[in-house]
UniProtKB/Swiss-Prot annotation:
ATP binds at residues 46, 96-102. Signal peptide: none annotated. Belongs to the GHMP kinase family. GalK subfamily. Substrate binds at residues 14-17, 196. It comes from Thermotoga neapolitana. Keywords: ATP-binding, Carbohydrate metabolism, Cytoplasm, Galactose metabolism, Kinase, Magnesium, Metal-binding, Nucleotide-binding, Transferase. The gene is galK. InterPro entries: Galactokinase, Galactokinase_bac, Galactokinase_CS, GalKase_N, GHMP_kinase_C_dom, GHMP_kinase_C_sf, GHMP_kinase_N_dom, GHMP_knse_ATP-bd_CS. This is Galactokinase. GO terms for biological process: galactose metabolic process. Mg(2+) binds at residues 102, 134.
Length: 350
């Protein structure tokens, strides 16, 4: 059996998903493709890496196989027996660009196992299994947005997701006359070893200091009670949630000018308050600001490298791409990669 699971891009709502916040992602037309078949032992093959790993029983290797192994462990923890299988994976998703290749791999694995063994679990349960794999087995304390979007993606729609209640709404993504591009800074971030988990701890500390259970209970007034660093982190989360709500409204009204401005202000907040951007992504956003037809841009993903989402009028980005590429190369001696992004449906058999 063969399945595919999409990556995702988050229009806005960065570092809110693990803080019970709002997010506005959509599944993208770049996928992890996965084939599953019975086997005498566990065999995991990656076409992209041209590598095969065999194991008698599931174990953690601190490698790409952990995403698959973690999913199998999560099934077993729930009492499902997963006998040895061969899983072959290929992908046209760029790694580390902020498109969440890891969640796509987890979702593809979870869906394939569920169908192959006849468990036929509902998608939401598979989302929870995939997330558990990343949090408990891989060791990255991610929110639920990435796996959720890979599962529930719908072509020509973004997902307005409340990560506290998991209530969601499909918002039409009518891009006629506009386009979304991803600029990959080609500065790589290893999430588990970066500041990502530290930001999570800081956010937990905010709640502890304020005596609150969730960020949804935190008010602007509460910020005054916090020491400087924690105040900045909390301010970003509160204001980013507001930006998501405004962005949903803008999308519904087809107001891409407003959406673009919200992207720029999101980046400023990620840079100055949450402090997860880096020199390279700041350079890209600053370069794009004020250019004709460029409506908005911001860093996407965990931060410290990765990608920049760019919202523009159709054709406007194409006109300045080379200039941006040259300026970036001159400054950092690194080549940029560009991806035009379109929406896609969620995980499915092929």
């Amino acid at each position: 059996m063969r399945v595919k699971a999409p990556g995702r891009i988050n229009i806005i709502g960065e570092h809110t998903d693990y803080n019970d916040g709002y997010v506005l992602p959509f599944a993208v037309n770049r996928f992890v493709f996965l084939t599953i078949e019975d086997s005498g032992k566990f065999v995991f093959h990656s076409e992209n890496m041209n590598e095969t790993v065999e194991m008698e029983k599931i174990e953690k290797l601190n490698r790409w196989t952990d995403y698959i192994s973690g999913v199998i462990k999560a099934f077993e923890k729930r009492g499902y027996k997963v006998s040895p299988v061969k899983i072959s994976v290929s992908s046209n998703l760029p790694m580390g660009a902020g498109l969440s290749s890891s969640a796509a791999l987890e979702m593809a694995t979870a869906y394939a196992i569920s169908e192959h063994f006849g468990f036929h679990l509902p998608k939401l349960e598979l989302v929870k299994i995939a997330r558990e794999a990343e949090v408990e087995f891989v060791g990255v304390r991610c929110g639920i947005m990435d796996q959720f979007t890979s599962a529930f993606g719908k072509k020509d729609h973004a997902i307005f997701l409340d990560t506290m209640t998991l209530e969601y709404e499909y918002v039409p993504l009518k891009l006629e006359g506009y386009e979304i591009n991803l600029v990959d800074s080609n500065v790589k971030h290893e999430l588990s070893s970066s500041e990502y988990n530290k930001r999570r701890q800081e956010c937990e500390e905010v709640l502890r200091v304020l005596g609150k259970r969730s960020f949804r209970e935190v008010t602007k007034e509460d910020l005054k009670k916090l020491p400087d660093v924690l105040k900045k982190r909390a301010q970003h989360v509160l204001e980013e949630n507001e930006r998501v709500l405004k962005s949903v409204q803008a999308l519904k009204e087809g107001d891409f000018e407003t959406l673009g401005r919200l992207l720029f202000s999101s980046h400023e907040s990620l840079r100055d308050l949450y402090e997860v951007s880096c020199e390279q992504t700041d350079f890209i956003v600053d370069f794009l600001k004020g250019r004709e037809g460029i409506l908005g841009a911001r860093m996407v993903g965990g931060g410290f490298g990765g990608g920049v989402i760019v919202l523009s009028k159709k054709g406007a980005f194409e006109k300045i791409k080379e200039e941006l590429k040259n300026a970036y190369r001159d400054r950092f001696k690194i080549e940029l990669t560009f991806h035009e992004i379109e929406s896609a449906d969620g995980v499915q058999k092929i």
